[in-house]
Amino acid sequence: MRYLVLGSEGQIGKPLVEYLRAGGHCVEEYDYQRDPQEDLRHLDQPVQSKIFLNKLKNCDFIFFLAFDVGGSKYLSKKEAEFDFLHNNISLMKNTFELIREYNKPFIFTSTQMSDMTHSSYGNAKLIGEKYTSSLNGLHVKLWNVYGPEFDIAEERCHVITDFVRSAKNSACINMRTSGREKRQFLYVEDCCEALVTLSNIYNSVDRSEQLHISSFEWTSIEQVARIISNIYSCEYTKGQEKDVVQLNLQYEPDKNILKYWQPKTSLLDGIRKICSHYN
C-alpha cells in the first residue's frame, strides 16, 4: 500500500514512517520541518499546492498527524494564543478540503483531550474529529504517546523525554508540579502498530465506535520521575505548579480498540528504550 504521512517528522510521524517501510510499504513523507514548502497552512499557494497534490494523488491512504503541538510546557504557554489556533485551524481546513475533493481514505489522530472543553488544543482536535466524521474517515484519540524526540525545541518536549534529558544532562529531574497527576502513557511503537492495524481494516471499522489508543494503565508523573531517576541514579524534586493543561481530569478511555489491537510495551521497558537512544 502507498501511504502518505502528514507530519512525518513528528514524534509519532517519524517512527510511523520507519514502521511502515519496515513492513514493506511505500511511504510518502510530508512535513514543513523537512521542507518549508510542505506546509499545510498554505495550500492556497501554487508551489505548496502542487507539492501536496502530487503526493496526495499518488497515495492509497493518509495518516493525518500534522498539528502544531508539544508537551505540557508548550501547551500551557501557547494553546491560548492566536497563532496556535490559527495554525491548526488553517492546516485542518486546507487538508480536509483536498481529502474530500480526492476522496482519499484517512485516519486523523486526535487526543483524549478532545473531551476536555477547557482546552484550546482539545477543542481544535475535536473540530478535526467532526471534519473526519463528515468525510466518513477514522479518527482515533491518542493517550500520551511517548518515544525518542530528536531535533526538537526543549519547550515542545513531552514529559518522559524531558525527564530523561534532564536526568542524563543535569543529573536531576525537576518536576514542574507535585507529580500527583496521572496519565496513561503509550510507547510510540505500539501506537504505530495500532494505526497500521486500523488502516488495514479501515472499511470494516464501525464509525460509531470511539477508538482510544492507550496503554489503559494510569501512572502518576512522580512514578515516571522515580523510574527515570532510578535508571540514572539521580534525584528528582517536586514543583509547585498546577496541572493547567489537563486540570487533573481522569476520563476512562473506551476499550473498543482492544478488539483490533492491544498494547505490548510496559512503561518501564518503554522508558528504557528511550534511555538507550540518548546514551
Regions inferred by a protein language model and the residue ranges of each:
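Hydrophobic positions on the long internal alpha-helix
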Residues: 91-99, 131-132, 194, 198
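N-terminal Rossmann NAD(P)H-binding glycine-rich loop of SDR-like oxidoreductase domains
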Residues: 3-22
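NAD(P)-dependent short-chain dehydrogenase/reductase
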Residues: 118-122, 126, 130-183, 188-196, ...
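C-terminal substrate-binding subdomain of Rossmann-fold SDR/epimerase-dehydratase oxidoreductases
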Residues: 7, 17, 167-279
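NAD(P)H-binding glycine-rich loop region in Rossmannoid oxidoreductase-like domains
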Residues: 49-87
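Adenosine-cofactor binding site in Rossmann-like domains, unifying the SAM/SAH pocket
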Residues: 28-51
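Conserved Rossmann-fold NAD(P)-dependent oxidoreductase catalytic core, especially the SDR/UDP-sugar
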Residues: 61-64, 90-123, 138
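Conserved cofactor-binding/catalytic machinery of classical short-chain dehydrogenase/reductase
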Residues: 87-94, 105, 127-128, 187-190
